[in-house]
Each structure stands twice: as structure tokens, then as C-alpha cells.
Regions:
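Polybasic/polar functional segments that serve as interface/processing modules
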Residues: 1-87
């Protein structure tokens, strides 16, 4: 179990993201699409085109963590937003 500090914000990147991206690519998406600093300690959540994969990017103060979850059946429900983010 990974515990997040209290006050940590979770940013959901609306739409779909290329799941081939790794640490640097997803950090760049957080900077460009959300105008957010990926090294601020907040959590950034990305969804793939098919909707069956999520990736979570988090800077824990020592380095970036990249977590992934793939569903064997079904899809993650995802918000739609024109600005690229949902709060």
C-alpha cells in the first residue's frame, strides 16, 4: 500500500493518452495539457485509448513513481472535458 500525504491533489487527464509514454512523456503531458508541475507531489492519472489501462504518475519527493493497472474485462469510466482536465 502506498500512502499519499494529506492534501495531495489528484489530477485526472481527460481524454485518452498514448500508453507507450513513460516517465518523461507523461510528465510532459502533465506540463502541457494541465499546465501543472509533475514534480509538485500531486498525482496525475492517465487513461489509454481503449479505456482498459490507467497510468498514475507521482513524485514522492525522491523520484517519480509510475503505476499501471490493466483491466482484463471492462473499461474505466472517464470524464470528458474540453480543457484537458477535470477537477
Amino acid at each position: 500500500m502506498i500512502g499519499l500525504p494529506s492534501g495531495t491533489r489528484v489530477w485526472i487527464v481527460a481524454g485518452h493518452t498514448d500508453m507507450r509514454k513513460g516517465f518523461d512523456g507523461l510528465a510532459a503531458v502533465a506540463q502541457t495539457a494541465l499546465a501543472a508541475n509533475p514534480f509538485c507531489g500531486h498525482v496525475f492519472v492517465f487513461r489509454g485509448r481503449r479505456g482498459d489501462i490507467l497510468k498514475v504518475l507521482w513524485f514522492d519527493g525522491q523520484g517519480l513513481m509510475l503505476l499501471a493497472k490493466r483491466l482484463e474485462r471492462g473499461r474505466f469510466v472517464w470524464p470528458q472535458a474540453t480543457s484537458g482536465m477535470c477537477r
